[in-house]
Amino acid sequence: MKLKNILIVVKDIEKSKQFYHDLFGLDTILDNDGNMILTEGLVLQDEKIWKDFLDKDIVHKNNSCELYFEEKNIEAFVEKLEKLYPSVEYVNRLLTHSWGQKIVRFYDPDGNLVEVGTTMS
């Protein structure tokens, strides 16, 4: 068995598709009308459809998980983030951990936590 995809719930699937394409270069593999699979295994799920499946409230900004990406040139990434999405809500602006890794954390347009860090290899 293997983990195939990670699904996040979004209010506006087109806006989220654009966000993940602009910042991470993710492209659409499959669009199933409210369920969109992007490259790298990320799935965007329309909030209304997900709520109907679960019959439970969606809790945005629950800070219980994050999407983690690695980027060699993190300073250039942060510049791109601030240029394309100047109103992004940061959790941590660019910082350097004691072990030398640089990271930045922010919310996507739907409150999903995203971290971008430098490679540690």
Residue ranges and their predicted role:
Residues 17, 36-37, 45, 88-91:
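A generic "structured core" feature
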Residues 27-61, 113-118:
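Conserved short beta-strand elements that form part of the metal-binding/catalytic scaffold
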Residues 8, 46, 98, 105, ...:
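Short beta->alpha transition motifs characteristic of CBS
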Residues 1-3, 59-64, 97-98:
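Short glycine-enriched loop/turn motifs at secondary-structure junctions
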Residues 13, 67-113:
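Vicinal oxygen chelate
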Residues 12-26:
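Amphipathic alpha-helical segments
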